[in-house]
């Protein structure tokens, strides 16, 4: 059986304790690999290796030299595309058609985009008068923040991990990555690519394990970690924030959400259905930017519900190797239990189950997988659990509205504010409503269109800070002002 070890100081090493845990294929419930669980000793070794690497060749390289190496990392991912694809789909169960189009290409792009971006960032400079008349010049320089603790999620493992590692390394930092215990494969595989690309030992380190009383907690509590970036649940973010408060270390969080979509009667209904199908059901609904609440203007409500129902029922459920499949399992049986508990809550609270609401019949060899049906509800009160709480599954509640102001109020009614979608052909309305929505990202007549130069992050309880483009540089560097008297 495959054995996944930590990657520390340029080498794959096991845990001194010998403790391991199972990595399970969510499509069939079979064990893929045994993964070493890091203790405090392994986490400390990784952090110290990262700290030492800051003073080694990596810390002495120019921006262009680092960029050249990161381009080789990106090329290494592309050269081993099929290996990364197989590993990502084994860990997540997602269709290969999805991972080959989004996850793996973006994993490579995250290194190239940020390497090139940093090469072209201008610095500010100001002349000033001085009391003696000689003058002075102020100019700003960016310096690496230091050792970055990266805690990445399981839904888009390679994409979201490299989204943090790419800019962190481009800025000259070193990293210690704690991937989700559910999806360790591509993070480990990236260690091999880093070695081959000539990344110095200690620059990229990986420790495997869980959160509380395990690698995640040990990493966030470590005093030699200079900053922490995390994607995951709001509750976990709160715990990390408490740990980071000791030492007053900066954090960047992308947290939970309960994203809303607003569909106006003047929309292009074909596009609204296609976009909503993706935003609700893509990746099994396990997308932080996905839509779990849809507000549809009353004149088109019935038609919209009927067409989204037909779309949900047309999804082909299957394994990553099924070329026809476009809907895979959830990440784990544990997560399935959570999602199914909300399916039951919806019924208990009086929902009309438009479609789904249970577990699909699967062949015997897949019976151990974490399968659920795509699900749509209507008829619930605005305060119902499935309307107000993040489920992170392939489901949504659809509610009619009559006035624009009502739709905005409903969309803004929760303590989350990550993303939103608007479907309308009225340009003035699109701009007006987008400006009123309390969300970090608003898509108009689209979903998941991403330009990596733009700001990414959530408002309210959906996050702290922004990453993407120069915003990533603001988090991963310290800005120093130098004043020179003439």
Swiss-Prot record:
Cited Gene3D superfamilies: Aldehyde Dehydrogenase, Chain A, domain 1, Aldehyde Dehydrogenase, Chain A, domain 2
Enzyme Commission (EC) number: 1.2.1.85
Stretches assigned to coiled coil: none
Keyword terms, alphabetized: Aromatic hydrocarbons catabolism, NAD, Oxidoreductase, Plasmid
Pfam family, one: Aldedh
Pathway the protein takes part in: Aromatic compound metabolism; benzoate degradation via hydroxylation
Active site: 254, 288
InterPro entries per record: Ald_DH/histidinol_DH, Ald_DH_C, Ald_DH_CS_CYS, Ald_DH_CS_GLU, Ald_DH_N, Aldehyde_DH_dom, OHmuconic_semiald_DH
Catalytic activity: (2Z,4E)-2-hydroxy-6-oxohexa-2,4-dienoate + NAD(+) + H2O = (2Z,4E)-2-hydroxyhexa-2,4-dienedioate + NADH + 2 H(+)
GO molecular function terms noted in the UniProt entry: oxidoreductase activity, acting on the aldehyde or oxo group of donors, NAD or NADP as acceptor
Keyword Oxidoreductase: yes
GO biological process annotation, one example: benzoate catabolic process via hydroxylation
Family per similarity comment: Belongs to the aldehyde dehydrogenase family.
Free-text function comment from the UniProt entry: 2-hydroxymuconic acid semialdehyde can be converted to 2-hydroxypent-2,4-dienoate either directly by the action of 2-hydroxymuconic semialdehyde hydrolase (HMSH) or by the action of three sequential enzymes, the first of which is HMSD.
Protein's UniProt name: 2-hydroxymuconic semialdehyde dehydrogenase
Naturally occurring in which organism (per UniProt): Pseudomonas sp. (strain CF600)
């Amino acid at each position: 059986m495959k054995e996944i070890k930590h990657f520390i100081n340029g080498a794959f090493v096991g845990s001194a304790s010998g403790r391991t845990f199972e990595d399970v294929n969510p499509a069939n419930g079979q064990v893929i690999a045994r993964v070493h669980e890091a203790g405090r000793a392994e986490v400390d070794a990784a952090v110290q290796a990262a700290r030492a690497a800051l003073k080694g060749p990596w810390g002495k390289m120019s921006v262009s030299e680092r960029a050249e190496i990161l381009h080789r990392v990106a090329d290494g991912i592309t050269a081993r595309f099929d290996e990364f694809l197989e590993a990502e789909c084994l860990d997540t169960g997602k269709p290969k058609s999805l991972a080959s189009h989004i996850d793996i290409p973006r994993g490579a792009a995250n290194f190239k985009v940020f390497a090139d971006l940093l090469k072209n960032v201008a610095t500010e400079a100001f002349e000033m008068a001085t009391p003696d008349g000689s003058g002075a010049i102020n100019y700003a320089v960016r310096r690496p923040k230091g050792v970055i603790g990266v805690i990445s999620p399981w839904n888009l493992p390679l994409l979201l991990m490299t989204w943090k590692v790419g800019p962190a390394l481009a800025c000259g930092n070193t990293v210690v990555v704690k991937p989700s215990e559910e999806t360790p494969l591509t993070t480990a595989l990236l260690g091999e690519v880093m070695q081959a690309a000539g990344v110095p030992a200690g620059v990229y380190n990986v420790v495997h394990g869980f959160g509380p009383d395990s690698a995640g907690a040990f990493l966030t509590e470590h005093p030699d970690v200079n900053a922490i970036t995390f994607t995951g649940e709001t509750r976990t973010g709160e715990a990390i924030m408490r740990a980071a408060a000791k030492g007053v270390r900066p954090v960047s969080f992308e947290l939970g959400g309960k994203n809303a979509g607003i569909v106006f009667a003047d929309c292009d209904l074909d596009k609204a259905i296609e976009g909503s199908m993706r935003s609700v059901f893509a990746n099994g609904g396990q997308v932080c930017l996905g839509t779990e609440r849809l507000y549809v203007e009353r004149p088109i409500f019935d038609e919209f519900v009927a067409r989204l129902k037909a779309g949900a029922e047309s999804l082909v459920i299957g394994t990553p190797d099924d070329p026809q499949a476009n809907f895979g399992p959830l990440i784990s049986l544990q997560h399935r239990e959570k999602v199914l508990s909300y399916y039951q809550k919806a019924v208990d609270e009086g929902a009309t189950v438009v479609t789904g609401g249970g577990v699909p019949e699967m062949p015997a060899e897949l019976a151990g997988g974490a399968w659920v049906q795509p699900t749509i509800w209507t008829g619930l009160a605005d305060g119902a659990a499935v309307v107000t709480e993040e489920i992170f599954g392939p489901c949504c509640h659809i509610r009619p509205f009559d006035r624009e102001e009502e739709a905005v109020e409903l969309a803004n009614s929760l303590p989350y504010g990550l993303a939103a979608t608007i479907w309308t052909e009225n340009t003035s309305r699109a701009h007006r409503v987008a400006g009123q929505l309390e969300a970090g990202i608003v898509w108009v007549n689209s979903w998941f269109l991403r330009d990596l130069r733009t700001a990414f992050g959530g408002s309210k309880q959906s996050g702290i800070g922004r990453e993407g483009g120069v915003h990533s540089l603001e988090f991963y560097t310290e800005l120093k002002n130098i004043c020179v008297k003439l």
